[in-house]
Amino acid sequence: MLTMKDIIRDGHPTLRQKAAELELPLTKEEKETLIAMREFLVNSQDEEIAKRYGLRSGVGLAAPQINISKRMIAVLIPDDGSGKSYDYMLVNPKIVSHSVQEAYLPTGEGCLSVDDNVAGLVHRHNRITIKAKDIEGNDIQLRLKGYPAIVFQHEIDHLNGVMFYDHIDKDHPLQPHTDAVEV
């Protein structure tokens, strides 16, 4: 079981590396890693388990965050009342198209690898299309908008050595861009 001690923190060199593409089929170890990443998210969202093991709640985890520089992400976004939830383990995800319109979370973003709160708006694409493989090597295509699009972009950034705060405007950190949508 992954815990917070398995998650590397800001400043670790792996977080700034471009992660390696995975060859398919995945090895047994790679599959086990991806399943453990998803399990961490499930556990982190369970109040009792999270408290018992000191887990910070998360909706996404990228392999580089557990010091594995490979292009794998897990995303688990619970239903917010809209009837939609997102539960994906993706291999070699790529954003193949995106909107011009930007979106941002008014509270900014957080990250399991960043212990401090970093003030500032993180502008991302409001709509994206992702192509990836699932754990068995099947093709996946996702069209996402709003909060799910933001979460997937955050995780894919980790695969490219980018941290969320890299997107914050240093001169005007709390200023929304013109025409950007608050999510």
Swiss-Prot record:
Record EC number: 3.5.1.88
Sorted UniProt keywords: Hydrolase, Iron, Metal-binding, Protein biosynthesis
Pfam families named among the record's database cross-references: Pep_deformylase (PF01327)
Cofactor note: Binds 1 Fe(2+) ion.
Domain of life: Bacteria
Active site: 155
Xref: Gene3D superfamilies: Peptide deformylase
Gene Ontology molecular function, alphabetical: metal ion binding; peptide deformylase activity
Catalytic function, reaction form: N-terminal N-formyl-L-methionyl-[peptide] + H2O = N-terminal L-methionyl-[peptide] + formate
Cofactor(s) the protein needs: Fe(2+)
Enzyme class: hydrolase
Entry-linked SUPFAM superfamilies: Peptide deformylase
CDD domains: Pep_deformylase (cd00487)
GO process annotations (BP): co-translational protein modification; translation
Residues reported to bind Fe cation: 111, 154, 158
Record-stated family: Belongs to the polypeptide deformylase family.
PANTHER family registered for this protein in UniProt: PEPTIDE DEFORMYLASE (PTHR10458), PEPTIDE DEFORMYLASE 2 (PTHR10458:SF8)
Job of this protein: Removes the formyl group from the N-terminal Met of newly synthesized proteins. Requires at least a dipeptide for an efficient rate of reaction. N-terminal L-methionine is a prerequisite for activity but the enzyme has broad specificity at other positions.
Protein's name in the database: Peptide deformylase
Taxonomic placement: Bacteria, Bacillati, Bacillota, Bacilli, Bacillales
Underlying gene: def
